Amino acid sequence: MKIAVLGAAGGIGQALALLLKLQLPAGSELSLYDIAPVTPGVAADVSHIPTAVKIQGFAGEDPIPALENADVVLISAGVARKPGMDRSDLFNINAGIVKNLIEKVAKTCPKACVGIITNPVNTTVAIAAEVLKKAGVYDKRKLFGVTTLDVLRSETFVAELKGLNVSRIAVPVIGGHSGVTILPLLSQVQYTEWKEDEIAPLTKRIQNAGTEVVEAKAGGGSATLSMAQAAARFALSLVQGLSGETVVECTYVEGDGKYARFFAQPVRLGKEGVEEILPVGTLSAFEQKALEDMLPTLRADIELGEKFVNN
């Protein structure tokens, strides 16, 4: 199976390349692309790690050589958030980058599963869908917004707060991938009892965790290492699914439109990408209200992406 990483010279991309070289199944191929001339060097560097994963690096304006015969494409290209910016400030730059790359995906590997990491994910996934649709190759089972970092953060913070073994914690996170659209379903976490005054602050911390990192890095970037681990976890689950195993991950996909055209929720991954979108389950009163409150924001984010391509 061939996995292409677009944006492989960036903070997320380099760490993601390392994690995939270490963890992809033997016999996999890893293809790294970035506009930056350092990219073949990143591939050379990572290639010295002794695992049975072949790796190649490509630089320059044209991602097509990196995309040929790809089964999975992960897009992390774009600019990172700096203090004072929110994810929507990234839109003006990253929207064009994602559009251009997806046009090349549509031409070169239209049947590949595509995972969008580039923020604002709520919007960039809609851009990708519209570009693929215009090219006549859109298959909603094969397009994903990678929201796994919200799950990782939720698992970490719940374990810390409750003094639990983090490996036993699973937290479904639904909605979108910015601010109020991130909704961890804490009421569904096993082995935990919640006090009234714990839920709202913890939810807010999960929603604002990206900003926490941006501020802590003091202008030196945004969450890259934890994001790379999240993307690696998602990519490895996707590869398992494509290989015929049953795996469930929360991810931002086009479903039945019950809440919004794109919505993050638990998804069973399989040989065609999305095998089945699973129900969100029973929500607490707090979660139900948070869900209703976020929908106008989420729908507006999606519409922004659709209009970017169609107007």
Curated annotation (Swiss-Prot):
One of its GO terms (molecular function) is L-malate dehydrogenase (NAD+) activity. InterPro entries: L-lactate/malate_DH (IPR001557), Lactate/malate_DH_C (IPR022383), Lactate/malate_DH_N (IPR001236), Lactate_DH/Glyco_Ohase_4_C (IPR015955), Malate_DH_AS (IPR001252), Malate_DH_type1 (IPR010097), Malate_DH_type1_bac (IPR023958), NAD(P)-bd_dom_sf (IPR036291). Substrate binds at residues 81, 87, 119, 153. Keywords: NAD, Oxidoreductase, Tricarboxylic acid cycle. NAD(+) binds at residues 7-13, 34, 94, 117-119, 227. The keyword Nuclease does not apply. Its EC number is 1.1.1.37. It comes from the Bacteria. It is an enzyme of class 1 (oxidoreductase). Pfam families: Ldh_1_C, Ldh_1_N. It catalyses: (S)-malate + NAD(+) = oxaloacetate + NADH + H(+). GO terms for cellular component: cytoplasm. The keyword Oxidoreductase applies. The active site is at 177 (proton acceptor). One of its GO terms (biological process) is tricarboxylic acid cycle. Belongs to the LDH/MDH superfamily. MDH type 1 family. NCBIfam families: MDH_euk_gproteo. Catalyzes the reversible oxidation of malate to oxaloacetate. Homodimer. PANTHER family: MALATE AND LACTATE DEHYDROGENASE, MALATE DEHYDROGENASE, MITOCHONDRIAL. This is Malate dehydrogenase. It comes from Histophilus somni (strain 2336). The lineage of its organism: Bacteria, Pseudomonadati, Pseudomonadota, Gammaproteobacteria, Pasteurellales.
